[in-house]
Amino acid sequence: MNNLEVVFQLMALFFVLAAGPAVVVLVASQKGNL
């Protein structure tokens, strides 16, 4: 596995972890729950 693949996997993991809560907050705010 090259360094580029490791960096890409870390970026993908970070994106998933960051996008999960962001989507939940976005949907909640759209529904007016916040």
From Swiss-Prot:
InterPro entries: PSII_Ycf12_core-subunit
Residue ranges crossing the lipid bilayer per the database entry: 6-26
Keyword set, alphabetical order: Chloroplast, Membrane, Photosynthesis, Photosystem II, Plastid, Thylakoid, Transmembrane, Transmembrane helix
GO cellular component assignments: chloroplast thylakoid membrane; photosystem II
Protein known as: Photosystem II reaction center protein Psb30
Gene name tied to this protein: psb30
Subunit relationships: PSII is composed of 1 copy each of membrane proteins PsbA, PsbB, PsbC, PsbD, PsbE, PsbF, PsbH, PsbI, PsbJ, PsbK, PsbL, PsbM, PsbT, PsbX, PsbY, PsbZ, Psb30/Ycf12, peripheral proteins of the oxygen-evolving complex and a large number of cofactors. It forms dimeric complexes.
Physiological role: A core subunit of photosystem II (PSII), probably helps stabilize the reaction center.
